[in-house]
Swiss-Prot record:
Family the UniProt entry places it in: Belongs to the UPF0102 family.
Name of the molecule in the record: UPF0102 protein HEAR0176
GO molecular function per UniProt: nucleic acid binding
One matching Pfam family: UPF0102
């Protein structure tokens, strides 16, 4: 059940920037021929920004956006702990399927205006 609009907390600047990054990533991946299955899948184990389909492969996408490359940039912010949470969330997502499809974990790293698509960035 969703809360009425007047009860929702205002979104932070960080959440707004994150949403914009996800929007950019989604448009880019759709132009590359991937189809959106689900956005912002949340479960007890974690969250997956985008679940896409690339042919017969299910793709779990983590989107990271940074204003600059300080502190290693967007890709470096996908820590081992974050990777574990993504894998747990993906396992929960895959419980929907009797015969889970092939899958992979990609990262879309956006540093300022530069976007990098890192396929198979996380191994489960």
């Amino acid at each position: 059940m969703r809360l009425p609009t007047f009860l929702k907390r205002p979104r932070t600047a960080r959440q707004i920037v994150g949403q914009m990054g996800e929007d950019e990533a989604l448009r880019y991946l759709q132009k590359q021929g991937l189809a959106l299955i689900e956005r912002n899948f949340r479960c007890k184990g974690g969250e997956i920004d985008l679940v896409m389909q690339d042919g017969d492969t299910l793709v779990f996408v983590e989107v990271r956006k940074r204003a600059d490359k300080n502190h290693g940039g967007a890709a470096a912010s996908v820590t081992p702990e974050k990777q574990k949470r993504l894998i747990v969330a993906a396992h929960i997502f895959l419980q929907r399927y009797k015969m889970p499809p092939a899958c992979r974990f990609d990262v879309i790293a956006i540093d300022a205006t530069e976007m990098n698509w890192l396929k198979n960035a996380i191994e489960s």
